[in-house]
Design a protein with these regions (language model features):
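Conserved donor-nucleotide/metal-binding helix-loop-beta segment in metal-dependent transferases, i.e.
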Residues: 24-50
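Residue-level signal for alpha-helix termini/capping positions
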Residues: 7-10, 39, 80
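Active-site acidic Asp-centered loop
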Residues: 19-21
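Short, glycine-/small-residue-rich phosphate/pyrophosphate-handling segment
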Residues: 57-58, 62-81
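A short, conserved beta-to-alpha structural element at the edge of catalytic cores
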Residues: 44-60, 125-131
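Short phosphate-binding loop-to-helix
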Residues: 1-15
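Conserved alpha/beta core of the MobA/IspD/sugar-nucleotide pyrophosphorylase nucleotidyltransferase superfamily
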Residues: 77-142
Length: 142
């Protein structure tokens, strides 16, 4: 479906934004900054925690995309091969997606004023800092 959407966009727009729907900390300011930067750049990529890709801004079909495990390096290498000079935009608010319970903890810590954090509070999700094998302990109250 993504390839079909990019084929549809080719010739109709200069660039596309490819982004998953599970980026709960993203805000208007974050997105505006990346879009403004993309006006002077051929290829912007935002990695996710764990080596994946959370956002790409590029010309439609500039590279073949493949999302999943360690896709970030694959996308950067593909952009390099096409001489697109990939620029990495490193942002906590755009790098966090929801894959683990620790990610829910990050939302509780950094997601002030987000709908996701409000919902997690309704579910009585609690987080505490720990310094063991995990950084955050996430529990659900009764």
């Amino acid at each position: 479906a993504l390839k079909q959407a990019m084929e549809y966009c080719k010739g109709k727009t200069k660039k596309v934004i490819i982004m998953p729907s599970d980026i709960p900390l993203i805000g208007k300011t974050n997105l505006k900054m990346v879009i403004d930067s993309s006006k002077q750049l051929d290829f912007i990529i935002i990695p996710s925690k764990g080596g994946g890709t959370n956002t790409i801004i590029m010309k439609p079909l500039a590279i073949r995309t493949k999302f999943g495990d360690f896709s970030y390096k694959e996308h950067v290498n593909a952009a390099d091969r096409k001489n697109l000079n990939p620029q990495v935009h490193d942002s906590l608010f755009m790098a966090l997606d929801v894959n683990t319970t620790e990610d829910l903890g990050e939302i509780m810590v950094h997601g002030e004023n987000t709908e996701t954090r409000r919902y997690l509070k309704e579910l009585k999700i609690n987080v505490e800092s720990v310094h063991g094998s995990e950084r955050l302990r996430v529990t659900r109250g009764s």
